[in-house]
Amino acid sequence: MADYLAGFYPEWVDKEENPRQIILDLGKMITNRIPVKLGFQKLNKYDPEYWGLAALLTDEQAEVALKMGVRKPKTMADMVKLTGKSEEELEKILGDMSFMGILEYNWENPTRTKQWVLPMFVPGSAEFTNMNDTILKKYPEMGRFFERMSRLPLEKVTPMVPPGGAGIGMHVIPVEKAIETENQSISVEHISHWLDKYEGKYAASPCSCRKSRLTFDEGCADDPEGWCVAVGDMADYVVETGKGGRYITKEEALEIFRKGEENGFVHQITNIDGADKIFAICNCNINVCYALRTSQLFNTPNLSRSAYVARVEKGDCVACGKCVEVCPAGAVKLGQKLCTKDGKQVEYPKHPLPSEMKWGPHMWDENYRDNNRINCYDTGTAPCKTACPAHIAVQGYLKMAAQGRYTEALALIKKDNPLPAICGRICNRRCEDACTRGSIDQAIAIDEVKKFIAQQDLDAETRYIPKKVVPSLNGSFSEKVAIIGAGPAGLSCAFYLAEKGYSPVIFEKNEKPGGMLRYGIPSFKLEKDVIDAEIDIIKAMGVEIKCGIEVGKDVTLDELRAQGYKAFYIAIGCQGGRKAGIPGEDAEGVMTAVDFLRTVGADESYPVTGKAVVVGGGNVAIDVARAAQRCGAESVAMFCLEPRDKMPASEEEIAEALEEDVTIDCGWGPKEILTENGRVTGIVFKRCVSVWDKDGKFAPAYDENDTKTVPCDRVFLSIGQSILWGDLLKGSKVELGRGNGAVADSLTYQTAEPDIFVGGDVYTGPKFAIDAIAAGREGAISIHRFVQPHSSLTIGRNRREFIALDKDNIKVEQYDNASRQIPGTRKDVDHKKSFRDAKLPFTEEQVKAETARCLGCGASVVDPNKCIGCGVCTTKCEFGAIKLHRERPECSNMIPSEKKLPYVLGNGAKQALKIKFSKKKEQ
């Protein structure tokens, strides 16, 4: 992938016939591009050094700057002598140039006399111009100017940069808590050292990288204000010259750093003045930061890395993946800790370094922001996390439960699933299907453990309400978001938006929220108080739910837009049933499964008399059959197309139905419903000879002559669901596709109407609650990025793609068999007739026994060649499994920028010799 941002210049440049020589001269003086500096390359009007300065400076201002020299402080007396201008003239010129960001000033001399400095472009004037809203609004090209000047000077030198960064740009400083116990640490490695050094002189100022990226629609959706903490005289400069600075206390600075760590931001300090001076401590987002880009794009970690390397204690790691999600360098990925069949540990590759081989553009990674979000190695990781649509940290919460850390376990689950008590009762348990333990005896009862953990949410005293983690120092976002539908996808989207600092409003057409959780799943599987408890938590997070409002009928999308809503998440599910298209299906006594379950969900006393027939073989059909039994049916018989071993319903669901005296007859499809006086009297089935065609597509074939007539009084059709749009999309650009579902981008869920996103069954067709929950989380991410103007919906986004380890290549002989725990049943409930849930949660003893069966398949693996020693990973680990170690003390060698050339060239020569002799040895 080439440099896709290359070649930009403002439109006005083409119209300028004669470039201003004084600007070309100034650009050459300031730039750090070596070919330009040495005269091998001449600047022209299309170079950023030219148009970036030409946009702002008059010839008079440029002449003053040329006389100052780069990074050579000048007092007013010096400036008068240099320019021959009066103090009054210079006050205006220097003031204007300081406001623009072309000059900075300080009082760093023995007499504390104010002095002006012409800084380098980066770090320097490129940042300062982007911090000034007035300048950036008038000259948006300055955003691209900063982007270019943070890259072009480095392209030729990056492979040669020695540890410590050689006074180039910025430098990672680790999370202080991560190195508190490191006895060998030195002062410059501690944020507290720099705060103490500049005691009382701090200012919170905007992040110039975040603001720059916004000018070309590559924002990261963070609020850019306040993340850069200026220290010393720079604090005065950013406050006094329109750079958005505000004075803060030391405590406020520490709070900014804490919030930065919560958000996974990397601390960096300026690194151009040696070990005795910095002027800013930044909290950097890898998706926009140009300083971090220097190491990540060029694959040259010396430009960023601290003296520390993260290491994982495999025995303590549970492969939750939270360190992986925040690692800015993609240095941590999920792997496995189980041995392969030959008894060996899996060996993981290390990233090549410029000290090991010839470097160049072929080794760069233009797509580093996406590639650094790859979650696991190709050899795979824990199958449970991989198989779960929400990719919950199963291994992690099992370990926490084993340790009795139940609240922490619940918190860990809610990072990926806001409805664990619900899912603990109704999930289709793909994690258990994939569980490695199943290769030995039986899979871990993962969902039962989750159900036990989530019982805390059913009690207001013990429920867990997540803390908000907001990428804004304001603590919240004001943009209004409407969610249409209070089912699992809508609730999940609302939860994660609230956690991010929004106050979304859910519009639900039914009387109560929950969607198909409430109106499509019988209470003997999912009690209503469980639904209510988890929804109450979402409300407590600041989500408003307006029931009894049908969008499209009671209020339109355009009316909501007029009320200030900036984005919409449509998650109305598949609320309609499907009929079979056969004679008699409109007779009295025929209902679709969806209609029947909705009726029973609202009124459990609804009567079903006589003989009932259920057409269908999925889990919904099982729910209908069992509900019909409880509603008083004389008998219930199920008929389905599939053979017994191919039924869509789970084995557990089928077993429960059979135990409740439901009969199941396989291999039949409906042909006709018999009626008398408009009412059902029976149903005729025809033999299904095949369900799928040779390509595996659903295409049932029948023997029309082989029929069966079944007398009955009620027929329930459980053969599919449909989407009931009503007038919701009236006047919108949303396109509909297969099954009348919304067409949307598969990553962002954005539709053809940019402010409308979709998720859950309305996009995928009928699936499971956990699929909708996973979609809701992704919808929240997209909406957050969308409503923050000029942000990218995709750059640096975690695709949530995982690979399961090879269970056939695991050494399992070392493990003893251990029986799976079975939950108890309530003695006070007739499990065949009652609508109450008869299943008990595990006891604490059962949880201990069951979690002990976990093999602990996965673990995080650090590539030390990619690690930049920021310590962000340590802030996310709940097990103390990943720690920083001071293995690269040379990376704390800070030198002034003016001395960089000997260090860079010396290291380059040293590397070249090493590579040369390495090749000779190989030969």
Predicted regions: what is each one?
Residues 85, 116, 268-281, 297-326, ...:
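Ferredoxin-like iron-sulfur electron-transfer modules
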Residues 112-151:
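Short, amphipathic alpha-helical interaction segments positioned at domain boundaries
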Residues 329-383, 398, 444-480, 499, ...:
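Flanking helices and flexible, charged tails adjoining ferredoxin-like Fe-S electron-transfer domains
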Residues 392-395, 401-402, 443-447, 483-551, ...:
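Beta1-alpha1 glycine-rich phosphate/pyrophosphate-binding loop at the start
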Residues 453-475, 500, 533-554, 577-631, ...:
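Glycine-rich dinucleotide-binding loop and its adjacent helix/turn
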Residues 586-609, 693-766:
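FAD-site-proximal beta/loop scaffold in flavoenzymes
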Residues 624, 762-787:
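A conserved FAD-binding loop/helix module that cradles the flavin
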